[in-house]
């Protein structure tokens, strides 16, 4: 099975990490944990409220603390926030304690998927498309750096993406458990 203690989903907002992650967790018998939701639960405020009251830097501190605590456990499917890879310590921990799946999505697909979403503080601006392009330019190399497996989700439903990942993960894990 999974050669790492946990399965970790990374990728930009709108890629499907939470939706697909829940499905994969159920399929593989893992406990699903959304890092953003864990932050909300621990802090007792919404993500927009945390950004407004404490700023992005404090949010990133909460994120790093919660991610570290989750990665110290086993048998979790951890859906990270899109910016979790910005912290080098997070990247190191993710790679050390997780098999990492990178879900990629294009900016046009993100704009469609996130059109009505008001819980993304970094997108509460008129220039959403430019912000997403800038984030992609900065974060995509970091997602690729930590990824053990990648999947383009633009034209896949959550069910299709899950089915593809189940097959690819099973094949990948079989290969990694085969004696050399």
UniProtKB/Swiss-Prot annotation:
Its EC number is 2.7.1.71. SUPFAM superfamilies: P-loop containing nucleoside triphosphate hydrolases (SSF52540). ATP binds at residues 14-19, 120. Its main location: cytoplasm. Substrate binds at residues 36, 60, 82, 139. Pathway: Metabolic intermediate biosynthesis; chorismate biosynthesis; chorismate from D-erythrose 4-phosphate and phosphoenolpyruvate: step 5/7. It is an enzyme of class 2 (transferase). Transmembrane segments: none annotated. One of its GO terms (biological process) is chorismate biosynthetic process. Keywords: Amino-acid biosynthesis, Aromatic amino acid biosynthesis, ATP-binding, Cytoplasm, Kinase, Magnesium, Metal-binding, Nucleotide-binding, Transferase. Belongs to the shikimate kinase family. Catalyzes the specific phosphorylation of the 3-hydroxyl group of shikimic acid using ATP as a cosubstrate. This is Shikimate kinase.
């Amino acid at each position: 099975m999974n050669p790492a203690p946990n399965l970790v989903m990374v990728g930009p907002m709108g890629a499907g990490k939470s939706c697909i992650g829940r499905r994969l967790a159920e399929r593989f018998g893992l406990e699903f944990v959304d890092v953003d939701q864990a932050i909300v639960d621990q802090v007792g405020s919404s993500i927009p409220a945390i950004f407004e009251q404490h700023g992005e830097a404090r949010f990133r501190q909460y994120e790093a603390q919660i991610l570290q605590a989750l990665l110290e456990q086993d048998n979790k499917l951890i859906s990270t926030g899109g910016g979790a890879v910005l912290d080098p310590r997070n990247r190191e921990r993710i790679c050390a304690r997780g098999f990492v799946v990178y879900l990629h999505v294009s900016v046009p697909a993100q704009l469609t998927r996130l059109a009505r979403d008001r819980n993304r503080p970094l997108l509460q601006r008129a220039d959403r498309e430019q912000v997403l392009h800038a984030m992609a330019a900065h974060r995509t190399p970091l997602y690729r750096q930590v990824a053990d497996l990648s999947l383009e989700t633009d034209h896949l439903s959550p069910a299709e993406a899950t089915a593809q990942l189940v097959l690819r993960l099973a094949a990948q894990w079989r290969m990694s458990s085969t004696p050399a």
